[in-house]
Curated annotation (Swiss-Prot):
The gene is MLN. One of its GO terms (biological process) is smooth muscle contraction. Plays an important role in the regulation of interdigestive gastrointestinal motility and indirectly causes rhythmic contraction of duodenal and colonic smooth muscle. The lineage of its organism: Eukaryota, Metazoa, Chordata, Craniata, Vertebrata. Keywords: Hormone, Secreted. Belongs to the motilin family. One of its GO terms (cellular component) is extracellular region. The keyword Hydrolase does not apply. Pfam families: Motilin_ghrelin. One of its GO terms (molecular function) is hormone activity. This is Motilin.
Length: 22
């Protein structure tokens, strides 16, 4: 996996996934 995402972008994506779960 190539980390072409920034740490902040990863956190935003994770938050979106959590919102989908809810």
């Amino acid at each position: 996996f190539v980390p072409f995402f920034t740490q902040s972008d990863i956190q935003k994506m994770q938050e979106k996934e959590r919102n989908k779960g809810q």
